[in-house]
Amino acid sequence: CLERSMSTTTSHALPSGAQPAPRSSVLVATSAVAAAGTMLMFGMLAMWLKFRDASPLRESARGKMIHDWLPSEIKVPEVATNTMAFTMVIACVMAQWAVYSTRRNDSSHATMALAVTAFVGIAAINAQVAVYLQMGMGLTDGPYQTMFYAVTGTMLALLVTGVAFSIVTMFRAVAGRLGDSSVMSAHALYWYFLTAV
């Protein structure tokens, strides 16, 4: 009698539900890193603005009172800085192309997009080094120089991690591990973060 009641109850059981969505811990972790990096960079820029606001006033060549925060002998090379800004936009396009190729299971295009992203990241690092060399100032030459190297050095470190992320993700694409697109999406998110800050 007991066997009969057990078979009856199992025949009336509900079917199993749908499988839960796969967890995208890489994407969540990258989002957390991007949020922390954004807070870091905006905190550093807030300190920069506070430093600039606390600088003494002087009369400009036009007769207006301005903050004397940038030493007169320092000139920021605009070509290298504008080139760096433009290359960051290209890196975002290439990172998104890698996501697009991954969703279509196209390993060769995903690999090429990631290689170009890494190359463009290296170009941005090169542009920052060119800015350092053209400006020709030392880290301890004054408060402006120290703040400049602190902010740009932090961004340079973030760029190096972006290039490393691109290379590791590229090796994953070369191996044909394109089943989960969350790694590529996390990679693209990181490059969006780098471009935004």
What do these predicted ranges mean?
Residues 2-197:
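...captures the hydrophobic TM-helix bundle architecture rather than a specific catalytic motif
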